[in-house]
Amino acid sequence: MTDPSRLVTPERRGDDLGDAALRPQNLSEFVGQQQARANLQVFIDAARKRKEALDHVLFVGPPGLGKTTLAQIVARELGVGFRATSGPVIAKAGDLAALLTNLEERDVLFIDEIHRLSPSVEEVLYPAMEDFQLDLIIGEGPAARSVKIDLSKFTLVGATTRAGLLTNPLRDRFGIPIRLNFYTIEELESIVTRGARVLGTPITADGANEIARRARGTPRIAGRLLRRVRDFASAADAEAIDRSIADHALGALEVDSAGLDAMDRRYLTTIALNYGGGPVGVETMAAALSEPRDAIEDIIEPYLIQCGYLQRTPRGRLLTDHAFRHLGLAAPSRDPAQFGLFGDTGDQE
């Protein structure tokens, strides 16, 4: 099974609790997402000048890119209260009502994984977002009655990694949709350098670059790798984290020069050696790796596709020549028709 403790997983792990100290506290400290950051600053400044609640905000993007951090920054920049929860935690309408009725004027309510809200909870959320009212049914049967409760004007900040799972009525109620993208190596270098400074760990420019190159475009992974490399530097009594220390530490942790770990390499090697580079169906790969299909599609494949190691074609998964070079293997000669005309249209399997 896919190990949730993978060092390069973008999902939150238990040891990421230490990331709180590394998080930027305001938009000026936040690195990357330049356009999103600039737009947010405009919307926040305008709401503050008008003394109004900010329009509801939806952050969309892969895990680990700073959606929660930005939500906290929004509240801090507005100078208002911040309450955080997640979609799966709000089990029934009463749970949501309790959260909403305790909000003060212009407060920020952050709902992570908002795509996982149940339909019954969503129905209660619609009038709350649009009219700042709760429509609740009190009692059951003939004695049931509808009650309207006025709410303080608040800002809902939602975060999702799966925008396609949001219902249209919910998505349309967010006035400020913002998509977050993967970070460049230069941006991650700045994040690693700042993180090392916060941790009180000297780091050289090439040491920060080495960590950034292997962080898969994701600040959460960069912070995690930095903490582990710092352990190796401390154990070796190194004066600073330089490229050689970072390279040794990350090699020992099985994170290679492209940021791939043992699971990624196993996936690529299986297609290369067992299936001639593909095409091979995702169900076949799930059986070969003893992994659920969802884990392959949502956890393993996205970064490999982003790096240009893998293509999803109408006939299945296909390794690129770039992947064979990374594995140190000779690429087979293939019919160009294997790549398909329209890219990722799903498996035949």
UniProtKB/Swiss-Prot annotation:
Residue span of region Large ATPase domain (RuvB-L): 1-183
Keyword Metal-binding: no
A Pfam family of this chain: RuvB_C
Catalytic activity field: ATP + H2O = ADP + phosphate + H(+)
InterPro entries named among the record's database cross-references: AAA+_ATPase, AAA_lid_4, DNA_helicase_Holl-junc_RuvB, P-loop_NTPase, RuvB-like_N, RuvB_C, WH-like_DNA-bd_sf, WH_DNA-bd_sf
Binding of DNA, residues: 293, 312, 317
Single Gene Ontology MF annotation: ATP binding
Subunit structure: Homohexamer. Forms an RuvA(8)-RuvB(12)-Holliday junction (HJ) complex. HJ DNA is sandwiched between 2 RuvA tetramers; dsDNA enters through RuvA and exits via RuvB. An RuvB hexamer assembles on each DNA strand where it exits the tetramer. Each RuvB hexamer is contacted by two RuvA subunits (via domain III) on 2 adjacent RuvB subunits; this complex drives branch migration. In the full resolvosome a probable DNA-RuvA(4)-RuvB(12)-RuvC(2) complex forms which resolves the HJ.
Function: The RuvA-RuvB-RuvC complex processes Holliday junction (HJ) DNA during genetic recombination and DNA repair, while the RuvA-RuvB complex plays an important role in the rescue of blocked DNA replication forks via replication fork reversal (RFR). RuvA specifically binds to HJ cruciform DNA, conferring on it an open structure. The RuvB hexamer acts as an ATP-dependent pump, pulling dsDNA into and through the RuvAB complex. RuvB forms 2 homohexamers on either side of HJ DNA bound by 1 or 2 RuvA tetramers; 4 subunits per hexamer contact DNA at a time.
Name of the featured protein: Holliday junction branch migration complex subunit RuvB
The species this protein was found in: Rhodopseudomonas palustris (strain TIE-1)
